Amino acid sequence: MVECYNFSCQGESHKADSKPCQDASFSAVYEDGLAIAIVCDGHGGERYFRSDVGAKMAVEVIFDTVKTFTSSIDKSLFIGQPYTAVEAIASEEILKKQTPVDKAFRQLFSSIIYQWNNRIAIHAAHTPMSEWEQEHVPQKYLDELNSSETFEKLYGCTLMVYVQTPDYWFAFHLGDGKCISFQQQPFWHEPIPWDERCFLNKTTSLCDSNAINEFRYCYEGDGSFPMAVFLGSDGMDDSFGEDANLVNFYIQVVKMLVTEGRDSTIQSIESDLPQLSKIGSKDDMSIAFIYSMCELQAHIADFIQYQIDIVTDSIRQTDERLKQLESKIAGITSVSDEKTRIDFDYAQKDIERANENRIKLLYKYDVLMQQLSKVFTNN
């Protein structure tokens, strides 16, 4: 049984500036087996003062176009296809080599762009400037609202989508944020190719003039499906820093789903993400995911074992670090001069910190081993 969930919350910095949440998310599972997860992130910055509207409209457009796409496309186009990942188009030569699947996706993306532009044009034409906009937005950006050439920038946003049917799945992405997929081999990866243009505060966008060539996507129709796919806006990955930390958070979500149930997991996510924004990125947070509870239950030991392997490797690295520090101290025969004394003191403090970290890692290891033992006992 495939299930889904999504949640968006206002970022801590947005609360301070009285700015709305500029993220939007959606997820749904239908009786025919279609499952959809969407995350759209409206751009920050003074120029993009209606990006919250742009993100919401992007979600609506994507939902409509994907439903139409999956109901009208010949599924034989996907059936039997191995996992395939396609990067953003960098040249006209790539366009000439497109497969029938590539052409179908290009039509889907073109429809999304066209319908989104139509909706924001209607909104811009019929929605006067609010008091907040007049008070907080520089006049040069307010003037763009009346410009037929640049008004779409005011609504700019990114998008990330995962779609699963009984016969195939696909995902596509425009902009930043992270899509993480869990399956048996490799255990986790980012199925959608990354775009190096998305770096720091720079990102590709639905409002770009060349957006049609900036979509990246992937698909598979050979009978293999992920156990779970998580979509997270950049407020999520910016808070966790390294991908490994973000992956560990998603594993914790998976473990909680299996051991404590859906309701407790949702309650935890909706209380934790605002706090994570407060101590982390300060940005809006969005998460959406599709998962098979049966698959997660069957493979929960793999999730725990992955964490055990990570902790074991961290213990090994800490032990190597301790040996290096102890060797350094052993080589100091005299602390008569100031530089040697300072080096000696730093090495001792580093050893203390490494030992404290090792104790914490050993505790984590013990807890994880107990969790793994419990899984095998229950089975």
Language-model features, listed with the residues they occupy:
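C-terminal catalytic subdomain
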Residues: N201-N379
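Active-site-surrounding "flap" and adjacent substrate/cofactor-binding loops of secreted or lumenal enzymes
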Residues: V66-G80
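N-terminal entry segment of metal-dependent catalytic domains or homologous docking segments
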Residues: M1-K67, T204-Y219, S281-K282, A288
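Catalytic core of PPM/PP2C metal-dependent serine/threonine phosphatase domains
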Residues: F78-I180, F215-G223
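PP2C/PPM family metal-dependent serine/threonine protein phosphatase catalytic domain
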Residues: Y5-K19, H126-E152, G156, S181-S224, ...
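Short hydrophobic beta-strand that contains or immediately precedes a catalytic carboxylate
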Residues: A37-C40, F172-L174, F230-G232
